[in-house]
A protein has these predicted regions:
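Transmembrane alpha-helices of multi-pass inner-membrane enzymes
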Residues: 67-68, 260-265, 382-392, 399-451, ...
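Alpha-helical transmembrane segments of multi-pass inner-membrane proteins
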Residues: 3, 16-24, 92-96, 100, ...
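Long extracytoplasmic/lumenal interhelical loops at the membrane interface
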Residues: 172-173, 184, 275-277, 282-348, ...
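Membrane-interface junctions at the ends of membrane-embedded or membrane-associated helices
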Residues: 73-80, 137-147, 210-216, 419-439
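Membrane-embedded alpha-helical segments of multi-pass membrane proteins
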Residues: 8-17, 42, 55-72, 122-130, ...
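Hydrophobic transmembrane alpha-helices and their immediate junctions
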Residues: 219, 264, 346-392, 422
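Membrane-interface catalytic loops of GT-C/OST-like multi-pass glycosylation enzymes that act
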Residues: 51, 235-238, 333-334, 398-408
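N-terminal hydrophobic segments of proteins, predominantly signal-anchor/transmembrane helices
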Residues: 24-50, 55-126
Length: 458
């Protein structure tokens, strides 16, 4: 029998959000930042706060309070210079213009109210680049960057635990759709959950390869072990492929021996993978005539229909966030390929804008890897680039780009890369004055879990 304390947890969390947000307005952003990062993938946890005043807007309250606090105390100097800003501005302007186009295309109300579903979707999409900017402004040193990563690790551990708890007692000896569960990721679905885990595996595996402090590496090994388990039994073929693509890219730069292991897995997967996972992979083609199984065949139908629609508006598309309201193929509201969706809704211009942004983000991480002279920043840079390769592939199988709980950490890590790129340019003496020596970071790795827990309960 439970203690009954669980009923007070949402209230305690809500009060912590309010207190930390008020504190952030006066320039003390650490608590608000940690709570913001911790809650990003925990969609069902955030849902429990919606009964409180502005409870559905806690993510906005947190990032806005941090942003306003930084601007009041330091102005624009709080944020590092970065070549990524023009690309983010281009994305926001294009999608907002396309949002209005979509209203005329659908014949609906103009997107000027938060109660409008399409405007709300666009606003939630734009929150993610703002989170990157907020992280880049609030995180000033390598030690603070380590704290951010440890909160990300702690939040991921909760995501993994929710999967274990939800699937406890289920028989994984053979595949069944009933085995699949999204845990706290919520409405992004099990494929969104799998994509989230894939991104985590690629990034932290890279950091494990590059960064040597034993305590930090042990923490990563434990998390990666649980994450790989979750990835396997999420039964997402797209996530499997995206993970292999990201790890293969990383292996070329820092762990070429890993390529041998990946090649062996590709060749011998029927010998080493669990039976249920093998059955899921083999389902792609089924039946005596070796035709596509129903879900894969439905995707092909969706893509063909979407491409026909794209041809009617090839330059600017039908408008941002319009496809889900058309119901052109059965009950589906998504093309199950994000690039196809972008082509349909924002046309060739939108696709070029998106792909250019994705590649520029990946290149920013790769630049940090080559320019940094310490293993920690190198690991963050290469890990982020590998993560972007994983994301590029994952979005071929559905929308893994506009859900905060799925790819919110991409933007958090982009903020770290933006700040890391500035740190890498400083003279060695300046960076030492910032307190980023290797032994200090190792000490922070030992203490960050307890500090994050204290911050979240203060």
């Amino acid at each position: 029998m439970g203690s009954g304390l669980g009923t007070y947890i949402p209230l305690a969390l809500y009060l912590a959000v309010l207190a930390s947000s008020l504190r952030a307005l006066f320039g003390k952003s650490d608590l608000a930042l940690y709570i913001l990062l911790f809650l990003i993938p925990l969609q069902t946890t955030r849902y429990r706060l919606e009964g409180f005043f502005l409870g559905s807007e806690i993510i906005d309250i947190l990032w806005l309070s941090i942003f306003v606090g930084l601007m009041l105390r330091q102005g624009t100097s709080a944020f590092p210079k970065s070549p990524i800003y023009p690309y983010l501005i281009a994305l926001s302007l294009l999608t907002y213009f396309s949002l209005w186009m979509g209203s005329f295309y659908l014949g609906t109300d103009l997107p000027i109210r938060l109660s409008d579903t399409r405007f709300s979707d666009w606003k939630n999409y734009m929150v993610m680049p703002m989170i990157a900017i907020v992280v880049a402004g609030a995180v000033r040193t390598k030690v603070e960057m380590t704290r951010v990563l440890m909160v990300v690790l702690a939040s991921t551990a909760v995501v993994n635990w929710s999967f274990f708890r939800s699937t406890n007692g289920r028989d994984f000896s053979h595949f069944s759709y009933d085995l699949r569960d999204a845990g706290v990721i919520g409405y992004a679905g099990v494929n969104g959950f799998a994509a989230f885990i894939a991104l985590i595996v690629v990034f932290f595996a890279t950091l494990l390869f590059c960064y040597k402090p034993k305590v930090f590496r042990l923490t990563l090994l434990v998390l990666l072990g649980f994450s790989v388990y979750c990835l396997l039994f999420a039964f997402s073929r797209g996530a499997y492929f995206a993970t292999l693509a990201g790890l293969s890219f990383v292996a070329v730069f820092c762990q070429k021996k890993l390529l041998i292991g990946i090649a062996a897995l590709v060749i011998c997967w029927q010998l080493v993978l669990p039976q249920a996972v093998q059955e899921r992979i083999n389902m792609t083609y089924g039946g005596s005539d070796n035709t596509l199984e129903p879900s894969a065949a439905d995707r092909v139908t969706l893509w063909e229909d979407a491409m026909n629609l794209y041809k009617t508006n090839p330059v600017l598309g039908t408008g941002y966030d319009t496809y889900q309201f058309m119901h052109r193929v059965a009950e589906y509201g998504d093309t199950h390929n994000y690039y196809v969706k972008v082509m349909v809704e924002t046309g060739t211009v939108g696709l070029i804008t998106l792909v250019t942004l994705l590649l520029r983000m990946a290149f920013l991480g790769l630049q940090l890897y080559f320019k940094a002279d310490d293993s920690f920043l190198k690991g963050i840079g290469l890990g982020f680039c590998g993560l972007m390769v994983c994301a590029l592939v994952a979005n071929c199988f559905g929308d893994r780009w506009t859900y905060l709980q799925v790819d919110g950490f991409i933007w958090v890590l982009l903020g770290c890369v933006m700040r890391g790129s500035e740190l890498a340019k400083r003279p060695e003496t300046t960076r030492e004055a910032d307190g980023i020596a290797e032994d200090e970071v190792a000490r922070m790795a030992r203490n960050s879990f307890s500090e994050a827990g204290t911050c979240l309960t203060t």
